[in-house]
């Protein structure tokens, strides 16, 4: 067993989830490559007196299920798994599918059924709100290919990024959290972007290894109806198996009134999932100094130093702006010079 896997498993169990004796832990792993880490997590859970409950997902089997799924089927599946999740104290999701596009040909109406009747009741309503949870990707050939890297070099990068001193990172975020907490209006400008919104009265929350690995962001949410202007995202975004590029959104009174991308019809179908899908649920700033370029993986891309993400869909309880949706889609814009630059003003201060 790679010693770095052992270090990561200990971090997940002892720092991220803080598993205590007698607590029940859902160990949810996706893809064959994740089995080694899943086994090590189970060992660490037992070491601290916890009780692991492993759950495996194969995305090819999931695709086959979703192609002809019904509302009634997903409602029952969601009810069963939500009941199980209610029993858990902690949750770790290790995701390592060997094909990020596996669900790309599932019809949008079927994905909407899955999001609304399964993902929302199981994950948003129970897992996020009632467990100490952490999610992460696991390095495999698919991820290395997306990062234009050999597998060995990508594994080295991955473990360097994931096995950071997150307690030290948390302390370093203090100033940014305080600054955001004291800000009313935010203005963001850049190539194709001129956007204004308020974050007044909504807490800024630091993220340092407790819910995501890798981590490194400070998030809040805009006042729901305060968003106006246009944003042009410069980072590809994989959602439901499809890679979106050149995404541009225009807002009026908080609502997305125009959306375009390399597949404008498909992206508008996502935003038509429900009313809340056309409003923003999160605004966050990425601060991980080890992540500097996109790799079509949200958990990494949203942490890029010099980036921000502006997220259509549901908000988090910790930074509640009242928006509710079956989707939560982190879309990333990088403002470093290599990606066109840009400026961010807090109450007119750069």
Give residue spans per PLM region.
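Short polybasic amphipathic segments
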Residues: 185-188, 247, 340-347
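Active-site bordering "gate/hinge" segments
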Residues: 1-229
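Intrinsically disordered terminal and processing segments
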Residues: 309, 313-350
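Active-site lining segments that contact anionic ligands and/or coordinate catalytic metals
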Residues: 228, 244-246, 253, 278-282, ...
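Dual-mode signal for accessory low-complexity, basic/Gly-rich regions
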Residues: 258-323
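Short, glycine-/Ser/Thr-/acidic-enriched flexible segments
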Residues: 32-33, 97-99, 140, 202, ...
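Oxyanion-binding "anion nests"
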Residues: 215-259
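Short acidic-glycine loop/turn motifs at beta-strand connectors
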Residues: 191-192, 199-201, 251-253, 346-349
